[in-house]
């Protein structure tokens, strides 16, 4: 497996938090915090894929690389595929890691951990999850659960993803973290697939891969990154990063 390429899709079209990637956190745009943490993961080059000049300029001002993509992609995965062909047309990177642009507090170590399952040639896509500890999250449809069985130390093979409380019975529930490491061929196959029945019902893009028979494995991690979707999330991220700077 070659060094992975980390791509961070970012655009301004958030409905609950307008101009989200450029939101100020500790004097810097949120997208810069995400980019910096991806660089600190130390697993490969990092590129931001965007359709917005201001986002590209923010990254380039820090010495980073950004590429411009089309504004009308149906999903982040399609933006990822376009960016991959722009950045690496010769196919030097056979793994691409998709880090969401709204995770300013993410631990670089879990970005690095995301590629671990791809050492197994049977795995098409790798991702992350964490044990749910807060009871209210177990029934929260905004907390996506991964259903799977253990295939190694701190690793699950995904059988399903759902917004419902699942699986039934005693044992932990796992919160899916929306960070993906794709084999390049798997990403190309994925974006060419039609939308799946379960994907439409649950509104979860990753179900398309499972419906097509692709294998997704997840590493179980301790740290659950804060996804910034609302003004309240943004204030929490500002507080968390301010505390980290003091320490």
Curated annotation (Swiss-Prot):
Enzyme Commission code: 2.7.7.38
Broadest EC class assigned to this enzyme: transferase
Pathway(s) annotated for this protein in UniProt: Nucleotide-sugar biosynthesis; CMP-3-deoxy-D-manno-octulosonate biosynthesis; CMP-3-deoxy-D-manno-octulosonate from 3-deoxy-D-manno-octulosonate and CTP: step 1/1; Bacterial outer membrane biogenesis; lipopolysaccharide biosynthesis
One example GO MF annotation: 3-deoxy-manno-octulosonate cytidylyltransferase activity
Gene3D superfamilies: Spore Coat Polysaccharide Biosynthesis Protein SpsA, Chain A (3.90.550.10)
Function summary: Activates KDO (a required 8-carbon sugar) for incorporation into bacterial lipopolysaccharide in Gram-negative bacteria.
Protein name as catalogued: 3-deoxy-manno-octulosonate cytidylyltransferase
Gene source species: Methylorubrum populi (strain ATCC BAA-705 / NCIMB 13946 / BJ001) (Methylobacterium populi)
């Amino acid at each position: 497996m070659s060094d992975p390429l980390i791509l961070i899709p970012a655009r301004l079209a958030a409905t609950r938090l307008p101009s989200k990637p450029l939101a100020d956190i500790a004097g810097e745009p949120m997208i810069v915090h995400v980019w910096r943490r991806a660089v600190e993961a130390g697993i490969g080059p990092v590129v931001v894929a965007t359709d917005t000049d201001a986002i590209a300029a923010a990254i380039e001002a820090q010495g980073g690389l950004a590429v411009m993509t089309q504004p009308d992609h149906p999903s982040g995965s399609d933006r990822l595929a376009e960016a991959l062909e722009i950045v690496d047309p010769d196919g030097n990177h056979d793994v691409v890691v998709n880090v969401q642009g709204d995770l300013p507090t993410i631990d670089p170590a879990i970005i690095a951990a995301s590629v671990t399952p791809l050492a197994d040639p049977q795995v098409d896509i790798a991702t992350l999850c964490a044990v749910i500890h807060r009871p209210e999250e177990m029934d929260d449809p905004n907390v996506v659960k991964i259903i799977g069985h253990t295939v190694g130390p701190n690793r699950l093979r995904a059988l399903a993803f759902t917004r419902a409380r699942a699986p039934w019975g005693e044992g932990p529930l796992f919160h899916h973290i929306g960070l993906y490491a794709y084999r390049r061929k798997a990403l190309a196959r994925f974006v060419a697939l039609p939308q799946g029945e379960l994907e439409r019902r649950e509104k979860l893009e990753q179900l398309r891969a499972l419906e097509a028979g692709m294998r997704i494995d997840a590493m179980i991690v301790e740290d659950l990154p804060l996804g910034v979707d609302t003004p309240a999330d943004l204030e929490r991220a500002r507080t968390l990063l301010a505390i980290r700077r003091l320490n």
